[in-house]
């Protein structure tokens, strides 16, 4: 029997401190949470209900879609299109903005999401997740255009992710710190288990895909080489290297015990100087990391200050423990 604060209770308490709050945002967040519970169920059942494996289709990124990519995208849409809180949605799995169907009322928020981050891992039973970002619509109750979504990350109202692992967790921020909730399946509710999450300023862990080492720029080459040199090198201490190929899993580890995550600019594909998508990966995760006391940068500018030029724009990402990110920034500025 749980004795903690449920997510619903937590959000309502937060709402009471906001003058003029109408409950619209709370209702939207409840719809997102319902979608996340449904996705968690689909991911957990996996092969039992025949949803594992790949399709013969690609998304706008040119990536082969997993069955669960399509299923989870549909779950997010169907749970959030009908209630009148949104004027539009955008997803990693859709080329263009999703317009709210005409029978449904239009609202004052925009929802951007990656329905199943790390889906390449899903057949291997490695942790995957959902990432989402909520923005205000520039013109409430009007069908959203592409331009309406192209807002810098500093304008996010809320950002969060769900982690589908040994337990299902929801981590979110509304700009007043970061809190983590764990799904109690006995009562069907998320319960506050990780209040006021903070990233340690120092760390001895870094996460990067070392197979791309030959394509990195000099500042990242230098930083990683110094970490690998350990206690006999210029940093004077040993580091551990991690890589899960799931941004949600990487960021969750950093929130829990510190670390630095890097998917830096490289020359592997000149058309893609960055790999991660700004709107529905880098921005929401950067909002969370900064609210937890960490830093997030492209190596050249703060990610939350980047003005998007395209819905599926890619950027380099370096985020995590403050002091380590500052070392990488120092090398970029040298």
Curated annotation (Swiss-Prot):
It catalyses: beta-D-fructose 1,6-bisphosphate + H2O = beta-D-fructose 6-phosphate + phosphate. Its main location: cytoplasm. Its cofactor is Mg(2+). Keywords: Carbohydrate metabolism, Cytoplasm, Hydrolase, Magnesium, Metal-binding. The keyword Zinc does not apply. Pathway: Carbohydrate biosynthesis; gluconeogenesis. Mg(2+) 2 binds at residues 114, 117, 281. It is found in: Cytoplasm. Its EC number is 3.1.3.11. It comes from the Bacteria. Mg(2+) 1 binds at residues 92, 114, 116. GO terms for biological process: fructose 1,6-bisphosphate metabolic process; fructose 6-phosphate metabolic process; fructose metabolic process; gluconeogenesis; sucrose biosynthetic process. One of its GO terms (molecular function) is fructose 1,6-bisphosphate 1-phosphatase activity. It is an enzyme of class 3 (hydrolase). InterPro entries: FBPase_C_dom, FBPase_class-1, FBPase_N, FBPtase. Pfam families: FBPase, FBPase_C. Belongs to the FBPase class 1 family. This is Fructose-1,6-bisphosphatase class 1. It comes from Nitrosomonas europaea (strain ATCC 19718 / CIP 103999 / KCTC 2705 / NBRC 14298). The gene is fbp.
């Amino acid at each position: 029997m749980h004795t903690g604060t449920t997510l619903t209770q937590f959000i309502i308490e937060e709402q009471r401190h906001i003058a003029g709050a109408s409950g619209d945002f709370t209702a939207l967040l409840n719809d997102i949470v319902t979608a996340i519970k449904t996705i968690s169920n689909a991911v957990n059942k996996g092969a039992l209900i025949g949803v594992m494996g790949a399709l013969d289709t690609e998304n706008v990124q040119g990536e082969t879609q997993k069955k669960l990519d399509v299923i989870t995208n549909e779950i997010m849409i169907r749970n959030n299109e009908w209630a009148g809180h949104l004027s539009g949605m955008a997803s990693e799995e859709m080329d263009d903005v999703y317009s709210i169907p005409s029978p449904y009322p239009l609202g004052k928020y925009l929802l951007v999401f990656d329905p199943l981050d790390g889906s390449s891992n899903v057949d291997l039973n490695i942790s995957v997740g959902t990432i989402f970002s909520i923005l205000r619509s520039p013109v409430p109750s009007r069908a959203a255009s592409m331009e309406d979504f192209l807002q810098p990350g500093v304008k996010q109202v809320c950002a969060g992710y769900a982690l589908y692992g040994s337990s299902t967790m929801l981590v979110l921020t509304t700009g007043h710190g970061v809190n983590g909730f764990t799904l109690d399946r006995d009562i069907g509710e998320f319960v506050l288990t990780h209040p006021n999450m903070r990233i340690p300023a120092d760390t001895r862990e870094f996460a990067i895909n070392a197979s791309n080492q030959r394509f990195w720029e000099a500042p990242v080459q230098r930083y990683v080489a110094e970490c690998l040199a350990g206690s006999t090198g210029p940093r004077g201490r040993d580091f551990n290297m991690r890589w899960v190929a799931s941004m949600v899993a990487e960021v969750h580890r950093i929130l829990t015990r510190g670390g630095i995550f890097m998917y830096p600019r490289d020359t592997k594909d000149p058309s893609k100087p960055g790999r991660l998508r700004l709107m529905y990966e880098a921005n929401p995760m950067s909002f969370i990391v900064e609210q937890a006391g960490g830093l997030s940068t492209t190596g050249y500018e703060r990610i939350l200050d980047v003005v998007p030029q395209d819905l599926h724009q890619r950027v380099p990402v370096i985020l995590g423990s403050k002091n380590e990110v500052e070392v990488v920034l120092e090398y970029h500025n040298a």
